[in-house]
Amino acid sequence: LGRTSENFARPPIGCIIPTAQGQMVMVDAGANVDEKAPVLVDFALAGSVFAECYLGIENPKVALLNMGEEEKKGPAVIQEAYQLLKNVDFINFIGNIEGREVLLGGADVLVCSGYTGNIVLKMIEGFYILHHELFGSIDTPAGRRFDETWDYRNAGGALLLGLNGTGLIAHGISDAKAIHQACLAAYRFASNGVAKKIGEKLSGMK
């Protein structure tokens, strides 16, 4: 598999995570580290197109994950990315959100480095594991909804955005259930032509 656009240099992992408002695309979830600000803008673009093409979110709200909401807060690379993003007309950039807002659904697309995103993802997985160890499976409608929503194995895998085909990343600790779900997810992505739609959008915007 190759990149959909020569201008889109570093395909990120677009991971769908549950929130209080529905679903959010987090990008990058671990494919890259030490990204520069223009690469984070690419991530925002790819995540926005993915949210639109696959989740059906019109004009998705895009936010940077940061240690504060203020424009001048956080690492220099995040501050630079902020300045770049607020001047991109075709991205609905709403600014920074803090870690406590992630699961509350403060945005439709959450942009961060692959290093940070992978930590966030595994914290969410750890939350589910801890809950399951403390309370087990709760056989009620609410308990079943909780398991269905938060069991990371149900996601199966996450899509590499910006390729000219379907590339799925599965978890290193995936069991049979997770691999089964990953195969189903790959089928859904491929049959819906997600990679092609993303590629067409990216090529037109870059």
Question: What are the residue ranges of the model-derived segments?
Answer:
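Glycine-rich phosphate/diphosphate-binding loop of Rossmann-like nucleotide-binding domains
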Residues: V33-G99, D108
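Glycine-rich phosphate/nucleotide-binding loop
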Residues: L1-V27, G105-K206
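Short, glycine-rich nucleotide/cofactor-binding loops
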Residues: A31-V41, I169-A176
